[in-house]
Amino acid sequence: MDGAVEGPALNSAIIPNLVAVIKDASAAVDAYVDVARGKCREALTKADGRPDRAALERQQHMAHGLSWLGTYAETLLQTAEWAARLEQEGKFSTTEALLTQILFSEYCAQLIGGVPMNQGEVIRPHELGIVAEADALFATPVVQQLIIDGKTPAVMAAAAECLPDALSRNTVEETGLDETMSMVREQFSKYASDKIKPHAHEWHLNNEYIPMEVVNEMAELGVFGLTIPEEFGGFGMGKIAMCVVSEELSRGYIGTGSLGTRSEIAAELILIGGTDDQKTHWLPQIASGEILPTAVFTEPNTGSDLGSLRTRAVKSDDGSHYSVTGNKTWITHPVRADLMTLLARTDPATNNFSGLSMLLAEKPRGTDDAPFPADGMTGGEIEVLGYRGMKEYEIGFDDFKVKSENLLGGVEGQGFKHLMATFESARIQTAARAIGVAQNAFETGLQYALDRNQFGKQIFDFPRVSNKLVMMAAELVGVRQLTYFSARQKDGGKRCDLEAGMAKLLAARIAWAAADNALQIHGGNGFALEYPISRILQDARI
């Protein structure tokens, strides 16, 4: 890799035949997690093999813990396969080797001793009934070697030597993506560095919208039509491109990284469930950025239980329109949106997902002074800690009119099904945004550690500081590969809801840990609002 640090001292910290070692370790971890899966299946399913909802609710700690074990296993597998590909291409340099070794050492140790699901929740082997298997996993020679030798002080110091050079690159490691994706990353990295990063903190502190000038520039760069097929005015690129663009824009500011999400959701809904006329009419306008969509799903008393939504859409006697009445909340960027993907109940006889329909509801753009100029629509801003730049709102509908021809697909009762079909992409994109935030936290913490001097030297030279940064970089290696794997599965037409969920789960924890540790590196300055790390921590919580 260009710019990577090499040398005898660094190479001596790498376990011999590392790629073969981690491949064998990954297989051992997979077998270990498979036993855990079997134990959980016994506890969480009925005699006929179907999930036991009461047991799942009662044993949420166990079920969530199994999710974490599965996520670790998949992350290590995808990291091992990435390492093997790089080695075959002659690109598995010292930097990649050290970070991979550290990741395997730490995750294997956690799988045996306890995986942190968050700061106050840990899943341990005895809670899954796999104590003997944990002992056996530690006794596996390659796993034991990685745990004992893979993350020593000397190894961490060697990895730390590789980090300062990373500030001149977009990622610490060689990601393994092709030349086209490297060019896409370079383009959006430069845009984020030049046009977003210098202003992001001011936008955040003032709770300002991302300027329309920036939105229009993003449209010109193709952000809103990235994955829309060329026949509908888009670029026809895959979810890998979506990941790269989301990463880089989120590295600049999470708001800009998320701007394209609503377009992605709307476009995928229309591609999956829309009529030919709806595709022809809406997709080119979404792709060009002429129309900005917003997703209007969540309600105040339902939260994630979308099947119990109460907002009603009643068809007029003449069949020309629907009248929508109800309340929605946590709606992102609705004021400046032109189109709402609005989930509402069209069958009043139902109280579950079967009576829900998706409406493509047009609305005029508003302003801060007049946020919702449309008849039958009101709203109030929800002031938020972070994730600013688009603004969150509660919205009330009272006889709000939507043309009948804007019923997605022209058939009622398909809304929940259509929405669920978009969740794979949404989770992948959420993971990519979290990676961008984590990358920003890493770079911000690293730069501060190199600039700040205490006791006559850079604070980066203290292991308690540099070790935090090394672990950030190592976890970024793993979660990138997990996220890219999910994207490749989606691009290949394969079901990937499990892998996409894993990527989102891990990336969110990594983003928060990276931001928290980067703020700690800043010491007292991290608590000062003038320092961007204070914003990054708030944005990471989302």
Roles of regions detected by a PLM:
Residues I395, D399-K417:
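Long, acidic (Asp/Glu-rich), low-complexity accessory segments flanking structured domains
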Residues G303, T329-P334, A426-Q429, R541-I542:
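Glycine-rich phosphate/pyrophosphate-binding beta-alpha loops
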Residues N301-S304, W330-H333, A349-T350, E383-K391:
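Short Gly/Pro-enriched turn/cap motifs at secondary-structure boundaries
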Residues T367-D399:
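Flexible, small-/acidic-enriched active-site or ligand-binding loops
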